[in-house]
Amino acid sequence: VDSIEEVLKKCGIRDGMTLSFHHHFREGDYVVNMVMEAIHKMGIKDLTICASSLGKAQNPIVPMIEDGTITNIQSSGVRGKIGEAISNGKLKGLAIMRGHGGRVRAIETGETHIDIAFIGAPSADDMGNCRAIGSQNGADCGVLGYAAVDAQYADKVVVVTDTLVPFPNVPASIDMTNVDYVVKVDAIGDPT
């Protein structure tokens, strides 16, 4: 798929969905902001963000909390301006904090249902086999294990990468049987 906007349409993005993201790029992450900016431009509202963690890198989504694009957050922690916005009552719905194991349990039991999972991957082939290493831009992250449960249980799984490699990209951290779409972007994160 050629763009975030195109993959959102293919996944049937609509109001009220739950979207998942991961924090393996820590404060260098570009994926959350990139996806949420595209969604915001489409006018989609009332979303639940189920992220393994949210930090200062995601501060640009605060206006989306304030305008109702994002109404619920599930995470292991929130820092920076997102934490301040939640503490100041700007989130219209619930903020649910769980440890990483609690997040996995909630997804496996169906307590949390993910409509679309976005997995930032340093490298992927066009079939979706992705790895935590191999980024042309140096944005390797070590592991994609946090995202495995999302890939297994989400209705749609989108791998976002800045490095497409020849098939097969093995050994894959997440294999193509659990991926619906691959989107190549200019950069998934800042390795510094």
Where are these regions (language model features)?
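Conserved alpha/beta enzyme-core scaffold
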Residues: 1-192
